[in-house]
Every structure is written in structure tokens, then in C-alpha cells.
Amino acid sequence: MSSRSVKSRKSTKSRRHHPYVKLTDKMFFSAISSKKELGTDFLREMDAPICTSKTILLPLDLNSISPGRCIYLSPFGHSSNMEFQCEKCTESKNKGSGDVSQNHDLYSVTLVFYKNVDKVVKHKAFYLSLLSHSMENLKKSFTQPELLYAYVVVKEAGHNVFPIFFEKDDCLSICLTFKCQTLHIGESCLRMLMDNLPNYKISIDYIKDVYAMTFTQCFAIQRNISIAEDTICESVSTLDCTDELREEIVKGINALQIKDI
């Protein structure tokens, strides 16, 4: 037997048993989004067109959406789209509205919490929805700054949302309800939430004629944040809860009881 054939078999055998690492979509897109030159090289080598739009189903775990994509929900179907091919994403960037990536304060959960936690009038709906359960829930929210962060980021993205709170596994969860027939969540908003809230499961569903984005804590992150809790609680207790706002809270709670979140 020739040495060449033996060498060939050894080479084939070594290739057959080479340990390959399974590359997930999330790992791949995270790599090319952080290293632009890698993404450019990959695009040059592609011999098949990019799928710019994908059909998605509700309920949807937002962690399943790859970086670079937005989501569009409507009565006629739901899709995940590449940002550069989405008219609404392009429009937001051109107008400078709804693109939260331009607001550098939003990159920090702690900074957003510090700057907004005492603005009880500005975030009246957030605090009165908490207070509708109990003062204890209001105080508990101070230990979960991610709740206020999620609310502020989605509002900054240009959405009119109403917050509903519920308890799960001794932690507070927040459900942001959107009263609209069609809903577009931009890529920058999705990335901001997913990158800065790794300890929360974020999902979206259609519940009782409203779209609902739910944030549920998976594990706690220790944050050393010192605030004037008593002063904030006193300010919240003096807020006027209108009949309209009270009705919003009741409707939201009833909707969540129908859907097992």
C-alpha cells in the first residue's frame, strides 16, 4: 500500500472527527454587528439573496429576533424585517424620532432610573398603576429599576403605552399595553431592551384587542442604588387618579387575568 493512500485516509479520518461548534443565529449576528468588516466580507461571499422579511407568530419571545431586525404586527399578519429594508425604520432615522439609539442616556439602566424615578408627575400612569395594588408594590419596584427602564425606553421610542403590573415568583412584572391596530417596534428599541435587560424574559402577544409587551424577571442583578424612597412614595400618594386612568387599570388587570402570562 502506498504511503500516499495511507496519508489520504488519515486526512479523511481527521476531517470526519473534527470537533465543530454549532453556531446559533444570535452568535452569528452578534459577531457581524460588532465587527462591520466581517459582515461586509460575508455579504461579498454570499451567492443567495438575503431574506429581508420573515413571518412571525404570537406570542413571540423577543429574544428570538436577530439583531438588525424590527417587528411589524397587524391584523393581516406579523413579520420580522431587516431594518435597512423597513420603510418605518428608515422614516424614523430620517426624522430623528423613535430611534432610541441616538439617546445615549438610555444605554444605562441605572442612569435612566436615577433620572426618572422622582419624576412622578411625568410618569403618573406608571406610579398610579403600581399604587393601585399597594404601597408595598410601589416600594418593591425600587428594587427592580428595570421596570421603569423598560417603560421609559418604549415611551422614548414614540409609543403610547399603558403599564399594568402583576406579581410572579415574588417579583414584579410589567405588561405594557399598546392600543393600536398595527404596531411597529423598531430595531433600535428592540436592541436597547434586549441588550440592557438580559435578566428579563421579554415577550409580546395580542390580548383582549391590545398588543401587550411583557417583562418577567428571570434572575436578579444586584444594583447599588440609593434614592429618597419616602419622599417619592409621599409624592405618588398625592397624585390624582382620574376615572379614565382608573378604568384603564381595571381593564388591563382583567385582560391579564384572562390570558395566563
Curated annotation (Swiss-Prot):
Signal peptide start-end: none
GO cellular component terms listed in the entry, alphabetical order: host cell nuclear inner membrane; membrane
Keyword Methyltransferase carried by entry: no
Cellular localization per UniProt: Host nucleus inner membrane
Protein origin, superkingdom: Viruses
TM region(s), chain numbering: none
Post-translational note: Phosphorylated at serine residues in the N-terminus. This phosphorylation regulates the localization within the inner nuclear membrane.
Family label: Belongs to the herpesviridae NEC1 protein family.
Assembly with partners or alone: Forms a heterohexameric complex with NEC2. Interacts with capsid vertex specific component 2/CVC2; this interaction directs the capsid to the host inner nuclear membrane to initiate budding.
Protein name: Nuclear egress protein 1
